[in-house]
């Protein structure tokens, strides 16, 4: 009696009515199969012997297998497993099956996709039903395991056309082994679709006309020859003998073919490595190619243009006082750089320059945030701050330390500036709402190619006097040290004695980076940021009266620039030069970051002022728009993001340790600075040299792997050639070697003028007598036998004046006899010459004495 096949539906699929055997049927079939297999083993008779001299034909299809084979146990693999069998399995067995079929991506302790027992078993049942359903598409359906994975991940059930084309075009003849021929083998799914009876359209396990003996025979006859087609093996008796004799040789050979990826071509190492053989022209060419708009930049008269041109500005509540301006203090001049890297001259704090800086740095506060409940939301942000960053046990067990010691250290530091204990004022008698204002005379180097269209505007400093700052700074310094001790291990603030950018055991490679660039950070802070700081300071243990007092005179303040005669009121925004500037900016950045991103997804988090950097194994997930809508900040997520913070790149060496490298582009620009004062003994130049050496102390750790990392990060950040960064390292290596090499980068007009007028060395002896005519600035070279005399005059008694220059041969190394002579050797000064051969030009290497002739001074 034929029963109608149940209709396909998800309900029939899950309850076992369609395509799934009931547990009773499965158990009954398994017991019958075991009994039949045991009977076959008892009735087995070995085959008759075959003549050894017979050779095996080369036709693969003519190979015959024995009718039966002894078996100690019969495998149950050909029995179909249904969804009910997986329901009876343990969780560990299901995890193994899930990892085998779905093949999830393992990321740490997480699986992607995640394991879900119900979804996995439903996917198995659905895959089995789809394989049994009639085919309606010409495309090739995936095998059982891949189909389960496709259903679980909600992807395509069919193989793509590219995969099918690859399977068709796969050529295996080139991989044949002499004497053997292999056939392509595809991975088995582990699922055997049950046979369907053509008469009753039922599964043959449940059909009366099912021939189990034929099924048993087909399974028992499967031998080694069914998987490996053997050709040309003479003298082989049968497959059993072949397996016993050649089995150890053939078993390791897997007849499995896959499309091999194209092997990567090994690129030979570049032999043109950066070395210390660098000259000044090479460094200038690097600047010209990397910074095309900086090479011809000269702002010598830019401020003159600003002061002399018409000026218009729009500011609210500004006060100008032009009656008692302080004139510029003249200095003794500055060293002139040989390199032209786009560095500007020092800015003078005139009225127009200060107004321009205030317009950009302090006025025109952006209003990008939405309306919120400040008190409630500020408390929530502070709570999130402590949950994300602070170790509560460490905070509870730590105390303030070294407050008085920090106070004495501050007084000793500024003792040379005239600060003493007698000058400390009574803070209750001072109006702390008044701040002094000034502009930074040194403009920050510009790395963008905009110097041809945009003039950099100097930054501003809003500060209290040292007598006031000295009483707040020790408290906030001790509080910041306590804050650092209570941070979680993955949080790093690279400042102070207990933290830096050197991270042992942490590798920045193969990590996702998140860098947030916050523009207009100081003036964008409002009352919401001040309330957040107040809650965080109270939570860190700062005395509540001091916190309240500090926040009160930051709500409304008045800044004044005495030199420029400019003053204006400000409110809430960050004071860039008080005792709480760095600490306050850091906790504001950390609080904003914790509210916009889940900090648990990061392995390392670095914060310093308004700079932030995070490292994670997965792409960071968060809402960066809250920086603007909630915190009133102009935020930009740097793409592509590289390990870069505080103008430094983070690199990892071969041992997995991370160290910091200053930005080569900014260091090259500093080599052309115009702010080094002139001194006779080069003390200021030597101080800059020592600072340059301290910043580049990483050069000894730069292996080829680190140089390659730096080149890649440099290209990603600036979209410029990474080879230029390697050449910059070669220049740094040369100019950090000794002070004499570093002195090649600067010269002074004063030295040059003195050298042209007069000089003294062992090769030349210059005798001067008074003359009524002006001294000539350039020497005229003529032949030794020229007897012409200089013009006579009545200067100084009317005596004739003749300058005699005698020439001596140079023997050995010349000794330096004066400071002017040493300056002549370190500075290259062009000397116009007229040689005896008639050639005229500028000679920088060989002195005139070695050319021959007489020099007249």
Curated annotation (Swiss-Prot):
Q: Where is this region: Disordered?
A: 780-857
Q: Which GO terms describe its biological process?
A: DNA-templated transcription; positive stranded viral RNA replication
Q: Name one Pfam family in it.
A: RdRP_2
What segments bear the compositional bias annotation Basic and acidic residues?
780-789
Domain RdRp catalytic as annotated: residue spans? 511-624
Q: Which reaction does it catalyse?
A: RNA(n) + a ribonucleoside 5'-triphosphate = RNA(n+1) + diphosphate
Q: Which CDD domains match?
A: Bromoviridae_RdRp
What enzyme class is recorded for this protein?
transferase
Q: What's the EC number here?
A: 2.7.7.48
- Function as written in the Swiss-Prot or TrEMBL entry: RNA-dependent RNA polymerase which replicates the viral genome composed of 3 RNA segments, RNA1, RNA2 and RNA3.
The family annotation for this protein states:
Belongs to the ssRNA positive-strand viruses RNA-directed RNA polymerase family.
Can you name this protein?
A: RNA-directed RNA polymerase 2a
């Amino acid at each position: 009696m034929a029963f109608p096949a149940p209709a396909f539906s998800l309900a029939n699929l899950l309850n076992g009515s369609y395509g799934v055997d009931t547990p009773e049927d499965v158990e009954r079939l398994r017991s019958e199969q075991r009994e039949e297999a045991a009977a076959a083993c008892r009735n087995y008779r070995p085959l008759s012997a075959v003549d050894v001299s017979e050779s095996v034909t080369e036709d693969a299809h003519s190979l015959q297998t024995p009718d039966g084979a002894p078996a100690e146990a019969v495998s149950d693999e050909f029995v179909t497993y249904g969804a009910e069998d997986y329901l009876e399995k343990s969780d560990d067995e299901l995890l193994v099956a899930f990892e085998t079929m779905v093949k999830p991506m393992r990321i740490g302790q997480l699986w992607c996709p995640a394991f879900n027992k119900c979804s996995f078993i439903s996917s198995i049942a659905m895959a089995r039903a789809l394989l049994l359903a009639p085919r309606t598409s010409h495309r090739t359906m995936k095998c059982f395991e891949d189909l389960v994975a496709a259903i679980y991940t909600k992807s395509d059930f069919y193989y793509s056309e590219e995969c099918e084309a690859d399977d068709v075009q796969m050529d295996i003849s080139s991989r044949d082994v002499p004497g053997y021929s292999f056939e392509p083998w595809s991975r088995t799914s582990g699922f055997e679709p049950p046979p369907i009876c053509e008469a009753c359209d039922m599964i043959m396990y449940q059909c009366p006309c099912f021939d189990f003996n034929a099924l048993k025979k087909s399974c028992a006859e499967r031998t080694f020859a069914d998987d490996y087609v053997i050709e040309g093996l003479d003298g082989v008796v049968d497959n059993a003998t072949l397996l016993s004799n050649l089995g150890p040789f053939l078993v390791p050979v897997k007849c499995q073919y896959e499309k091999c990826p194209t092997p990567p071509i090994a690129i030979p190492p570049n032999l043109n490595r950066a070395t210390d053989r660098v000259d000044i022209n090479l460094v200038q060419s690097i600047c010209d190619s990397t910074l095309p708009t900086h090479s011809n930049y000269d702002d010598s008269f830019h401020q003159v243009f600003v002061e002399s041109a018409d000026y218009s500005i729009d500011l609210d509540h500004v006060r100008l006082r032009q009656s008692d301006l302080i004139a510029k203090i003249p200095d003794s001049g500055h060293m002139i750089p040989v390199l032209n890297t786009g560095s500007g001259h020092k800015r003078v704090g005139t009225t127009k320059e200060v107004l321009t800086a205030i317009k950009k740095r302090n006025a025109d506060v952006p209003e990008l945030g939405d309306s919120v409940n400040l008190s409630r939301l500020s408390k929530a942000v502070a709570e999130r701050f402590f949950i994300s960053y602070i170790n509560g046990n460490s905070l509870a067990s730590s105390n303030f330390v070294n407050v008085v010691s920090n106070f004495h250290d501050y007084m000793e530091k500024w003792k040379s500036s005239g600060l003493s204990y007698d000058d400390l004022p009574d803070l209750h008698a001072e109006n702390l709402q008044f701040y002094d204002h000034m502009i930074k005379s040194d403009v920050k180097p510009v790395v963008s190619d905009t110097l041809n269209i945009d003039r950099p505007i100097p930054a501003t400093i809003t500060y209290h006097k040292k007598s006031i700052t000295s009483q707040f700074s020790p408290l906030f310094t001790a509080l910041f040290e306590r804050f650092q001790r209570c941070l979680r291990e993955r949080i790093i603030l690279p400042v102070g004695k207990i933290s830096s950018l050197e991270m042992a055991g942490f590798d920045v490679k193969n990590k996702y980076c998140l860098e947030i660039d916050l523009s207009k950070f100081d003036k964008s802070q409002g009352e919401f940021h001040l309330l957040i700081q107040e809650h965080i300071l109270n939570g860190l243990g700062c005395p509540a009266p001091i916190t309240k007092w500090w926040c009160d005179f930051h709500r409304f303040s008045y800044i004044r620039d005495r030199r420029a005669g400019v003053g204006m009121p400000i409110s809430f925004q960050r004071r860039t030069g008080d005792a709480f500037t760095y600490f306050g900016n850091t906790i504001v950045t950390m609080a904003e970051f914790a509210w916009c991103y889940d900090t648990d997804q990061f392995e390392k988090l670095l914060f310093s002022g308004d700079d932030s950097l995070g490292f994670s194994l997965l792409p960071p997930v968060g809402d960066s728009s809250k920086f603007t809508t909630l915190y009133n900040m102009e935020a930009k997520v740097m793409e592509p993001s590289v390990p870069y913070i505080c103008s430094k790149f983070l690199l990892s060496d071969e041992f997995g340790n991370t160290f910091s490298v200053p930005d080569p582009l900014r260091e090259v620009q500093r080599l052309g600075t115009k702010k080094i004062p002139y001194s006779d003994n080069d003390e200021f130049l030597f101080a800059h040299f020592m600072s340059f050496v301290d910043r580049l102390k990483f050069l000894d750790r730069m292996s080829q792997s680190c140089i390659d990392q730096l080149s890649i990060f440099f290209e990603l950040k600036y979209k410029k050639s990474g080879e230029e960064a390697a050449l910059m390292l070669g220049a740094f290596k040369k100019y950090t070697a000794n002070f004499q090499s570093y002195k090649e980068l600067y010269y002074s007009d004063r030295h040059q003028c003195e050298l042209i007028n007069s000089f003294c060395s062992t090769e030349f002896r210059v005798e001067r007598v008074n003359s009524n005519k002006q001294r000539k600035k350039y020497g005229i070279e003529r032949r030794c036998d020229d007897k012409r005399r200089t013009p006579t005059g009545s200067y100084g008694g009317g005596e004739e004046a003749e300058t005699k220059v005698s020439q001596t041969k140079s023997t050995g190394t010349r000794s330096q006899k004066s400071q002017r002579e040493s300056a002549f050797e370190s500075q290259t000064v062009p000397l116009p010459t007229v040689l005896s051969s008639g050639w005229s030009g500028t000679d920088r290497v060989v002195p005139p004495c070695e050319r021959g002739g007489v020099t007249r001074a």
